[in-house]
């Protein structure tokens, strides 16, 4: 595996770009999708948009330790395929839903299917030589940022040109490609030698003040970053007074956030 680590890194990075683009390309027009396609009233759209947006992260956060444990016991490649297939299915379903309740259920499914990024990282750390691991993870992080930048712009453009439902199908197709690539081109990383761990190591880690403080800082930072995302499109519509191409402008606004993050990283 180590002889082909550059090819594996290239495939993983390309998958990360497609994954991030698929994640973010739907964000700019989700409020309009709820109102125009799913019949949500203007008075209720903020509530529905916030609930639909956040439920995926809630479920994903709860399931992350479980998927991580299964990756150690069942295999990292299997978890990557599971996440990719589940996300692809959820996006295809998102393109055919007709009610906000159905869309909420789709986002719940996305939460259960989360874990693709962590699976990519785990595979990279297992297959890339240790002396090249730092630069390899940096390249993958750059790919993640690139996908976050181009995703909203592509999603807003597709929604403008071909309709909002088309963007769901494109995202589903991208994630299907990722799943197939993992199935046929990424080898299963060798299992690490079992180590005797102390009882309840998570509890011991949380007893360290620096770990607790770091987790709090990360949680607050993520909360601030995600706070405006559910309402940014609605705010753009309010500023433009309903004139102009709201979905495209929202896509540009979200992409600029990614550009700023890349510059300051």
For each feature predicted by the language model, list its residue ranges.
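Short amphipathic helix-loop junctions that connect adjacent transmembrane helices
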Residues: 29-46, 231-248
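Juxtamembrane intracellular "pre-TM" segments in multi-pass secondary transporters
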Residues: 2-5, 187-216
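Central cavity-lining transmembrane alpha-helices of secondary-active solute carriers
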Residues: 51-67, 255-264
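Conserved MFS/SLC helix-loop-helix module at the cytosolic interface between two early adjacent transmembrane helices
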Residues: 62-98
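Pair of pore-lining "gating" transmembrane helices in MFS-fold secondary transporters
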Residues: 4-32, 36, 210-227
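Paired small-residue
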Residues: 90, 101-109
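Cytoplasmic helix-loop-helix junction between adjacent transmembrane helices
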Residues: 106-144
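C-terminal membrane-cytosol helix-exit motif in multi-pass small-molecule transporters
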Residues: 173-192
